[in-house]
């Protein structure tokens, strides 16, 4: 189906501007400061450097690291290493100027269980982004995010079955990202402990709903 109100969210820029907005309104942001453990009954954060902080309530939205902060989640959600590739679109060829045509294209999602992918059209100078939507259900989020060239090319090959004019020769770069997957792909938003709340299991969809 086609959703006319759909569009591209530039996550990095949105987070950056949100942080500036909150800072100007007195919200204290602990940038680049990791949390080692969370006591969700007492709302105490342990930063792992000998310091702690007690707050009113704790919301844990830690992506693929959620199981390390909340071991009780380990049987409910699984970190899943996924691949994302960026494609340079041709401006001339048998199908014409694909670079221009794709700028007004919608986001696409192919939910094929074997070779599913999503495509994000190029906006604001970005390249066409294609990601695999076939859950690996493996990987450690602390590992590097490099992707082998052959593995990245395979993602382009899956998409090329549906998208004319795109081949592995157009592959520019690739990286890995992580989903946190619940067995039935149901989002988890619920209280935990006396003063905690957890948000997890978004299967890569969390940002747009946030």
Language-model segment annotations:
Residues 7, 51, 123, 168, ...:
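Structured beta->alpha junctions
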Residues 2-48, 53-57, 61:
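Helical element adjacent to the flavin cofactor pocket in flavoenzyme catalytic cores
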Residues 196-210:
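Glycine-rich phosphate/pyrophosphate-binding beta-alpha loops
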């Amino acid at each position: 189906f086609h959703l006319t109100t759909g569009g591209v969210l530039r996550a990095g820029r949105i987070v950056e501007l949100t942080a500036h907005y909150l800072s100007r309104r007195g919200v204290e942001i602990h940038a680049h400061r990791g949390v080692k453990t969370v006591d969700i009954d007492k709302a105490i954060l342990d930063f792992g450097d000998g310091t702690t902080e007690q707050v009113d309530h704790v919301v844990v939205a830690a992506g693929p690291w959620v199981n390390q902060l909340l071991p009780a989640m380990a049987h409910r959600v699984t970190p899943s290493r996924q691949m994302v590739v960026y494609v340079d679109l041709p401006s001339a060829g048998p199908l014409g100027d694909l670079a221009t045509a794709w700028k007004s294209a919608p986001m696409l999602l192919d939910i094929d269980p074997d070779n599913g992918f999503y495509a994000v059209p190029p906006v604001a100078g970005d390249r066409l982004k294609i990601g695999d939507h076939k859950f690996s259900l493996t990987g450690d989020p602390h590992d590097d995010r490099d992707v082998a060239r052959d593995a990245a090319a395979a993602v382009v090959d899956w998409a090329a079955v549906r998208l004319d004019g795109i081949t592995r020769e157009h592959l520019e770069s690739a990286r890995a990202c992580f989903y946190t997957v619940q067995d039935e792909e149901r989002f988890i938003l619920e209280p935990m402990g006396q003063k905690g709340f957890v948000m997890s299991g978004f299967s890569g969809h969390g940002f747009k709903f946030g």
